């Protein structure tokens, strides 16, 4: 059984598992798969060809563009933006912002990024396109140059 809020919109080929909670004004594109036990809060937009595996929480105001994959246990905090073709490994987290309500996106993950499993991205950090983080990395600053980043805190590997 799922709980789906008001004004929910989905494209064709939308699939949803069991025991999900979807808030009001959520828009989901074509060929989207939402696994089991996901929580999607109000005013979230999800593009086409997106997979949310399961046990995922997406906070209000978040936008996920096309061709993204979020593995089990991913948590996206308020107003996060995932650009096209982002992969979030299992149990990755974007950490929350400030107490102030913002209308612009806080944490931004650029196109073609791969976030390794268990990684954390600090509040309101921005990753440019084509960034890879190793598993269990902690992103505590903006990343403005494409490359591979690892460690706590992250440092550029190459």
Annotate each predicted stretch with a short phrase.
Residues 125-127, 142-145:
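C-terminal substrate-recognition "lid" of short-chain dehydrogenase/reductases
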Residues 1-9, 15-127, 152-157:
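Flexible, glycine/small-residue-enriched loop-and-beta-strand segment within the central core
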């Amino acid at each position: 059984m799922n709980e789906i809020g008001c004004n929910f919109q989905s494209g064709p080929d939308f699939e949803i598992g069991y025991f999900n909670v979807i808030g009001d004004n959520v828009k989901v594109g074509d060929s989207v798969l939402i696994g089991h036990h996901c929580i999607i809060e109000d005013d979230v937009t999800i593009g086409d060809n997106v997979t949310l595996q399961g046990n995922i929480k997406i906070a209000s105001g978040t936008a996920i563009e096309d061709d993204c994959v979020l593995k089990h246990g991913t948590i996206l905090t308020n107003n996060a933006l995932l650009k096209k073709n982002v992969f979030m490994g299992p149990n990755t987290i974007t950490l929350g912002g400030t107490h102030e309500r913002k209308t612009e996106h806080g944490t931004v993950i650029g196109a073609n990024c791969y976030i390794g499993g268990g990684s954390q991205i600090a509040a309101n950090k921005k990753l440019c396109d084509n960034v890879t983080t190793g598993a269990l990395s902690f992103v505590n600053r903006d990343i403005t140059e494409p490359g591979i980043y690892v460690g706590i805190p992250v440092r550029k590997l190459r």
